Amino acid sequence: RICYNHQSTTPATTKSCGENSCYKKTWSDHRGTIIERGCGCPKVKQGIHLHCCQSDKCNN
C-alpha cells in the first residue's frame, strides 16, 4: 500500500507500507488544525477525528 505520510500543510510525501490501510488524523490545538497522515489505522484518543481507507494514496 502507498500512503501519504506528511503533516498538515507540508509538501506531500508518500511511503510504501506493509499495512493494507492508510490513515488521516485531524485535531485542533493552540496551533490550529493539525492533520497527520500515515500507514495503518491507529487507535486515537477522544476528540481526534480518524479516517482510515484501503487504497493507494487514499488518505490525502
UniProtKB/Swiss-Prot annotation:
Chief location category: secreted
Which pairs of positions does the record mark as disulfide bonds? C3-C22, C17-C39, C41-C52, C53-C58
| PROSITE patterns per UniProt | SNAKE_TOXIN
* Tissue and organ distribution: Expressed by the venom gland.
A GO term for molecular function: toxin activity
Query: Where is the protein situated, by its record's location annotation?
Result: Secreted
Q: Which InterPro entries match?
A: Snake_3FTx, Snake_toxin-like_sf, Snake_toxin_con_site, Toxin_cobra-type
State whether keyword Zinc applies. no
Sum up the protein's function in the record's words.
Binds to muscle nicotinic acetylcholine receptor (nAChR) and inhibit acetylcholine from binding to the receptor, thereby impairing neuromuscular transmission.
| Protein name per its UniProtKB record | Short neurotoxin 1
